Amino acid sequence: MKQVPVPIPLTCISCKLLEHILASNTMKQLESNNILFEFQHGFRENRFCESHVIFMIHLLTYNKDENIQTDLMIMNFAKDFDKVPHKRTVYKFKYYGMSQQAINYITSFLSNRTKTVILENTTSEKIPVTSGVPQGTALGPILFLIYINDLPQYIKNSQISLFADDSIIYRPIHTLTDCLKLQEYFEAAIQWEQDWLMAFHPDECNILRVTSKKKPGHFYYNIHGHMLQTVHSVKYLGITILSDLKWNKHHLKQTDPYHSFDEILK
């Protein structure tokens, strides 16, 4: 299995303590003032990966039972947490009304950061870090939530659900007009990524058509001129979603490792 190195933030104890205090107070302000997008399920109290999945499956099942086709696209950011520009993060912190004290701390927290690679007994030169929320920190996920919080505002009247950096844009399909509208949502999302220096990964963005119809409506969606592939199943947050919403493929994937283990024991 390919191993991807994970950066380790080096911060002193006092900094970590202040970070946790600021993270806690920031989330309280965001939640009490209803600043965060309603359907953002990541890194929030009483909202989890499970709540996001249940919400989507319930919605898709309802539409399917009503004989309504739902087209959806799962959008993945390329390098997600590593792409967030520091100066623009501070700007959004100000935009959402955080105190000047908190803004000063965030500015200091993100400024003058460097990274280095240690391999065995060799250490590389330090390189300045001007983007990316520090992973492994209490503030990192909150800064990311704040940064992508206005994505749904670009997609006016859209249907979008988020779990941190995983975005699902969807729409019930009745006529060709709905398909064209969904394509407009995708283009609005592209405008957001260009405005805020982020990037979606077109090769990992697929279209799933959830329907009970024998002859579902077809439309060729695209991002950056890249024709999106229509798939019959997609793995999302640990579950396998089929276009007919059956669970046999997910069940097989979950039980297959145990089956292989039994074969080894034999």
Q: Where in this protein do the model-derived segments appear?
A:
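Conserved pre-catalytic core of RNA-dependent polymerases
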Residues: M1-P134
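Catalytic palm active-site di-aspartate
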Residues: V6, Q40, T70-F81, G132-G136, ...
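Hydrophobic (often cysteine-bearing) scaffold residues that line and stabilize catalytic clefts
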Residues: L10, S14-E19, H52, P85-H86, ...
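Inter-domain linker/hinge segments that demarcate the starts of reverse transcriptase
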Residues: I21-T26, H52-K64, C179-W196, F261-E263
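Active-site palm subdomain of RNA-directed nucleic acid polymerases
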Residues: L22-Q40, P141-Y170
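Catalytic palm subdomain of template-directed nucleic-acid polymerases
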Residues: K79-Y96, S167-Q194, W247
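Basic, alpha-helical interaction scaffolds
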Residues: K156, H226-K266
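Short, conserved micro-motifs composed of acidic
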Residues: E184, A199-S233
